[in-house]
């Protein structure tokens, strides 16, 4: 008898607690640290903070969803991701029709600049750059597919995309939490201004080394390289989960041994032994590029700091 009386009370209490949690603000989950950093900046001063699904040391290319992370997603009012070409481990979950209203896919936003993925090995001469307004540049047709749609999914490494993403985040949050709509939109504008200053500082820092040639671990940086006019010559892999074949390795070994490379960049999340084997055969500078900001503290300054950290790493390894 007591159990029959208590059960409705327990259910009512659970519903009340859940409602109170929602009354405290929207439950937001950002899939990767760069998205989390932008969202934290947009939510500053609202009394709410986003949750981070993947820590910076985990590559989204190689991630596997744990039960605790699945629970985070299940409880979220808003899930912010780059898109299915990056967070492939979420495809089966987030692409379900019932989740459409809860998911903000940043790579699909109007105004986002997408860069064509380049093949592993030596890059071809040319990169497509386009947005929803049809902006394109000349390119070669000899590239291999980078991801599902052939476009580089690392859209956050172009600061122009960072501005677009911040505005979209603010607009979506304003719908979920109208009481703080002005705060969200003001924060997005403030982040855009900080990115203006960051972009100017990076442009000045990298100007002396724009002509210096280098190799990267995987083709993740087309947005950053295109924005700042850099001179990459190739990538060891088109994507970390797809290591190059023997022909590509030989091609890259030849490039490195030619003496025309100022630096070879690896990544803290991914540092394959076969890259080290190639480097051991040659006297070439080695640097580290961190597209996810593994060493940076999370928070409102994370995203501008991530871009600046990339610039510093490039400058320090490429300078004569």
Which positions does each model-derived feature cover?
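Extracytoplasmic metal-acquisition and chelation regions
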Residues: 20-320
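N-terminal secretory signal peptides that target proteins for export/translocation
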Residues: 1-2
